[in-house]
């Protein structure tokens, strides 16, 4: 029996060292308020995370600032056919909203008005107080029809739709939005002094006009089968002239395309609809800022004549459609 106890007992010197090490760990944990479970357990409770994050870093919620960050900075495709593939309809999922204090200026924003085949609306009206995203270089305004298989339109990648200082998980009808996420920044607490320093700059008068000093260009589209497997998108030049969009493109390309059609008098001269297609040889990604590093070397050798008629618009591939009450003659 004595030998059995000897196996369980620690030598006196080793026991002292082990006890000292245990006390050091306990005192170390109490000194820095770090939960011991963080070493072996990845699922921490909220209180443990608060102790870990907030000590000497966050002393007040006033140090937290919410910022809206746009997705287009990641280099995602921003043309309407590509963007609409990232959105889908779902039923039975309640929408969620969160406010934010500051945001970026967006290159591309979207504004949707989609109806079902029976004439009913696909998208809900925005709640009271919700306004469109205020800083957009291009607003892609899309009107059309679709099956809309669900109650609300969500982002398939889990991102938010950014409105004016409000982010929502759903798209609201006729309200301009940008795609993005919400980030929370922890600002260092300013040191308190007993005297008040003189401000470095005089206060600047602000305005409630969210569109001041920022030029916004609206591009219009017509879309059919929105929310379906295969959708069709037309760029609207005027009420009777359209361009079929079959490839990813940039808003700058559409602006130049619009100018080319008008400058060369290629608009519909009747009450019928005239639809053009773009020559496949033309690169539609001119001016894309997200790919500037890969494209900037090509600009000095690119001839802008490629965007002039007839190279950018192929008259032999044009699609002519007649609307009721008028014929659309072929352009020469």
UniProtKB/Swiss-Prot annotation:
The keyword Iron does not apply. InterPro entries: GPC_FiloV, GPC_filovir-type_extra_dom. One of its GO terms (cellular component) is extracellular region. Disulfide bonds join 109-136, 122-148. It comes from the Viruses. It is found in: Secreted. Glycans are attached at residues 41, 205, 239, 258, 269. The keyword Amino-acid biosynthesis does not apply. Keywords: Disulfide bond, Glycoprotein, Secreted, Signal. Residues 1-33 form the signal peptide. It holds the Pfam family Filo_glycop. Belongs to the filoviruses glycoprotein family. This is Super small secreted glycoprotein.
């Amino acid at each position: 029996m004595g030998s059995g106890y000897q196996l369980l007992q620690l030598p006196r010197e080793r026991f002292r060292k082990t006890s000292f090490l245990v006390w050091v760990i306990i005192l170390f944990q109490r000194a820095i308020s770090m939960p011991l479970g963080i070493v072996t357990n990845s699922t921490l409770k909220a209180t443990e995370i608060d102790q870990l994050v907030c000590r000497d870093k966050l002393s007040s919620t006033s140090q937290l600032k919410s910022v809206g960050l746009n997705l287009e900075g990641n280099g995602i495709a921003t043309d309407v056919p590509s963007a609409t593939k990232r959105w889908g309809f779902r039923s039975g999922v309640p929408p969620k909203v969160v406010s934010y204090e500051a945001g970026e200026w967006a290159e591309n924003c979207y504004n949707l008005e989609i109806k079902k085949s029976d004439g009913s609306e696909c998208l809900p009206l925005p709640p009271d107080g919700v306004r469109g995203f205020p800083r957009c270089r291009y607003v892609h305004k899309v009107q059309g029809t679709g099956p809309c298989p669900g109650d609300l339109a969500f982002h398939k990648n889990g991102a938010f739709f950014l409105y004016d200082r409000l982010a929502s998980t759903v798209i609201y009808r006729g309200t301009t939005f940008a795609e993005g996420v919400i980030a929370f920044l922890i600002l260092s607490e300013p040191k308190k002094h007993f005297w008040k320093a003189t401000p470095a700059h005089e206060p600047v008068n602000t305005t409630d006009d969210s569109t001041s000093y920022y030029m916004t260009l609206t591009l219009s589209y017509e879309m059919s089968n929105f929310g379906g497997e295969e959708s069709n998108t037309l760029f609207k030049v005027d009420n009777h002239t359209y361009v079929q969009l079959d490839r990813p493109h940039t808003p700058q390309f559409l602006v130049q395309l619009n100018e080319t059609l008008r400058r060369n008098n290629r608009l519909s001269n009747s009450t019928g609809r005239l639809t053009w297609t773009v020559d496949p040889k033309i690169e539609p990604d001119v001016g894309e800022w997200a790919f500037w590093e890969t494209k900037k070397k090509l600009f000095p050798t690119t001839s802008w004549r490629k965007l002039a008629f007839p190279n950018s618009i192929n008259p032999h591939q044009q699609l002519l459609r007649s609307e009721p009450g008028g014929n659309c003659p072929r352009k020469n």
